[in-house]
């Protein structure tokens, strides 16, 4: 069955229904559609309704005077009598009187045609008749009990329906915890202690949590430990002034692999290298304090220079500089012989040795043929004669 929307018609509901002929529907109603087969009085009553204006029937089943117009507000009749109309429209195929298959009698009002004031008041009163009383709705659907908190909402196990027919999985209300109590007036009651400047031997005495309090600026931003202060701490056992009365724990220096040439003489004399490495088993000495600082990072494992691209850390700034070139692709060092570029100077130096070896080989090959091509002096045989 198909339905189409009708075009906008400048007519009202009552005028649309008045144009329908009286003999539109036959008196014989099929048994499938006959709702009142047992009572002839009821059928006669509805047959009488077919010849009258549907919109002109009041609540008391009395025909009003046609000259009277509908008022803006519909007054209910005494006795609280209501009339309920039941009907069914079924179209198997397009009929002769309705080629467009208009199946809704309310199409004149739905399509947006402004109805007359009388028709508007009639539709409003009809809608109020269809709505059930509020008392019947409350009797059919009882009010929900009030809940004091969210925990009372799940007082019974919650089950989920399975469309395949399996029994539902029940969840006990213990799985759903009640609402958490509100926080007290203290915004940060407990915070963990993430102190990164304690020695591993003192970790047992540090509590896991402590009440929120003002942080010491020295703990937040500890002063940097210079290599000279580190050496003094090893030699003189002095206490660092920035940490108050707490003794400064000894700096753990990791052993490193032995030097390849431990007894190799240095170009700088010994008296010009006053800064010795304090690590046990390390005999390195340096002429400048920054060189000792850089060397101590090998023992401590401190890597303060971090790449912002891959977050890799380095102990020396020059190592970070050459590492960043791997990301940027910069190659500032060019070979003097072939023009090939490198990111590190030691790579260029290693590459230059190849050209030097090739040059030496060419010079050796060039000197060998010159020696062989030298003229050979042949001595003539000496002939002696006897007199």
From Swiss-Prot:
It comes from the Eukaryota. Signal peptide: none annotated. Pfam families: DUF3446 (PF11928), zf-C2H2 (PF00096). Residues 241-283, 348-387 are annotated as: Disordered. Residues 350-360 have a biased composition (Basic residues). One of its GO terms (biological process) is endothelial cell chemotaxis. Probable transcription factor involved in muscle spindle development. The keyword Nucleotidyltransferase does not apply. This is Early growth response protein 3. Disulfide bonds: none annotated.
